[in-house]
């Protein structure tokens, strides 16, 4: 509580509720801090990366997968956007398997399309490959996707549980 005394303020005392709150604050145990800051890179030897990044990072039981493009054996696959969608999902499955997870444990998917007219074809394959219940999802058209000059029309990334 504050009381005015002339031009000065005096602190009479702090309320009991404030004191009990202060006493309830304790330092976080060290093992919690260590567990929260642990992150493990995941890379499948069966897949190649298009840049300086990890294919996934595992942190606190959650797997954050980098975007996958339709590459198999180091080459962009030819075919429809449906074929490319299937390959992206197969690549994600490989990364998740390497991380000790699976497609069943995906909770969020982000899809990046070079052309939103491909939305229906992507949905057809997506529905066939991913098990129910389907994860939360965003699908957006972007100006370009990686390796678009080589025919890439889609990139898919996801977040999954361990």
Swiss-Prot record:
Keyword Ligase: no
GO cellular component term, pick one: cytosol
GO molecular function: deaminase activity
Source organism: Schizosaccharomyces pombe (strain 972 / ATCC 24843) (Fission yeast)
Subcellular location: Mitochondrion; Cytoplasm
Protein name: Protein mmf1, mitochondrial
SUPFAM superfamilies, A to Z: YjgF-like
Function in brief: Plays a role in the maintenance of mitochondrial DNA.
Keywords from the UniProt entry: Cytoplasm, Mitochondrion, Transit peptide
Gene3D superfamilies per record: RutC-like
